[in-house]
């Protein structure tokens, strides 16, 4: 089977994607698959470089990769690929839209507003949300251009910076508490990990530095675990996720869980959360890649 690891891309998360792709290449069973690295440098590359593949193993992140566009191209070309489909990928990449779906389904998520320009900033609504707030690109990832803002005077500059990366910026309530991630594979919850950041919040550096943050299997009290599990699986379902995705949450100091976001192409670097969760379940990195390929192919057949 000819498997192409699709990596690189044109988003602000290109370097993370390249790291994920290299890590997958180093761990995939090369006796089982005929493997090639396919580095995307511009949009047209996807049309030219995937020809002849039996399977596309996606290691892309951010725009034109995690947002459904590449998935749609591959659907048109009838090439099976890993993970969620075009609709789910697009929906989860758009934080505003995904939060609207969660709210409509009575799934708890932090309060938020969005703006598309400096002129649209509604300081009264931000006051209602309450400082501090997070300001970040609506379609961003890996905490690129994400700012924790404590006062009104700093909102404008943070929004301006976010608008450099996306046409819409989300301003979201900060919830103090324990950050956890719920890896879901084929509709099943894998071991939950707690993220213990060494900084004020889990930013880009904390996510990808070798010693940036601790990722620890967490034991939750049963009633809380049951609630977290139900929320995570329902989120996976209502956002139309397939094969695998990571549902990030925060548990407030009062013990109330909130959905933060859903990652439809979770990182696959040496420090990434999903491979660590699989490992704690006794699934090696190489075996996990096998499972992703097998389950994704079964999805395509259905």
Curated annotation (Swiss-Prot):
Gene3D superfamilies: 3.40.50.20, ATP-grasp fold, A domain, ATP-grasp fold, B domain. Transmembrane segments: none annotated. Binds 2 magnesium or manganese ions per subunit. It catalyses: 2 D-alanine + ATP = D-alanyl-D-alanine + ADP + phosphate + H(+). Its EC number is 6.3.2.4. Residues 99-294 form the ATP-grasp domain. GO terms for molecular function: ATP binding; D-alanine-D-alanine ligase activity; metal ion binding. Keywords: ATP-binding, Cell shape, Cell wall biogenesis/degradation, Cytoplasm, Ligase, Magnesium, Manganese, Metal-binding, Nucleotide-binding, Peptidoglycan synthesis. InterPro entries: ATP-grasp (IPR011761), ATP_grasp_subdomain_1 (IPR013815), D-Ala_lig_Van_CS (IPR000291), D_ala_D_ala (IPR005905), Dala_Dala_lig_C (IPR011095), Dala_Dala_lig_N (IPR011127), PreATP-grasp_dom_sf (IPR016185). PROSITE patterns: ATP_GRASP, DALA_DALA_LIGASE_1, DALA_DALA_LIGASE_2. It is an enzyme of class 6 (ligase). It is found in: Cytoplasm. Pathway: Cell wall biogenesis; peptidoglycan biosynthesis. One of its GO terms (cellular component) is cytoplasm. One of its GO terms (biological process) is cell wall organization. Belongs to the D-alanine--D-alanine ligase family. Cell wall formation. This is D-alanine--D-alanine ligase B.
């Amino acid at each position: 089977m000819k498997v192409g690891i699709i990596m690189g891309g044109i988003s602000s998360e290109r370097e993370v994607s390249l790291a994920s792709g290299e890590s997958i290449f180093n761990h995939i069973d090369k006796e089982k698959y005929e493997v090639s690295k396919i580095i995307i440098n511009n949009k047209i590359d996807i049309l030219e470089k995937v020809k002849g593949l039996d399977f596309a193993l996606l290691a892309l992140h951010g725009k034109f990769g995690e947002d459904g566009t590449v998935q749609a191209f591959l659907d048109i070309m009838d090439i099976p690929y890993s993970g969620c489909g075009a609709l789910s990928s697009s929906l989860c990449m758009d934080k505003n839209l995904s939060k609207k779906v969660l709210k409509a389904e009575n799934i708890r998520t932090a309060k938020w507003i969005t703006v598309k320009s400096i002129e649209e900033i509604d300081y009264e609504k931000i006051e209602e949300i309450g400082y501090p707030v997070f300001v970040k690109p609506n379609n961003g990832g890996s905490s690129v251009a994400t700012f924790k803002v404590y006062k009104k005077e700093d909102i404008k500059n943070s929004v301006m910076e976010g608008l450099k990366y996306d046409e819409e910026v989300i301003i979201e309530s900060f919830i103090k508490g324990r950050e956890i991630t719920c890896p879901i594979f084929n509709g099943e919850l894998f071991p939950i990990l707690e993220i213990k950041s060494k900084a004020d919040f889990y930013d880009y550096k904390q996510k990808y530095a070798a010693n940036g943050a601790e990722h620890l299997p967490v034991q939750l009290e049963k009633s809380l675990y049951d609630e977290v599990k139900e929320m995570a699986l329902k989120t996976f379902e209502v956002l139309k996720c397939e094969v695998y995705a990571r549902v990030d949450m925060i548990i407030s100091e009062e013990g109330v869980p909130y959905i933060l976001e859903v990652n439809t192409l979770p990182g696959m670097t040496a420090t990434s959360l999903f491979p660590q969760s699989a490992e704690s379940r006794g699934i090696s990195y190489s075996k996990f890649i096998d499972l992703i390929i097998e389950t994704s192919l079964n999805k395509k057949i259905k």
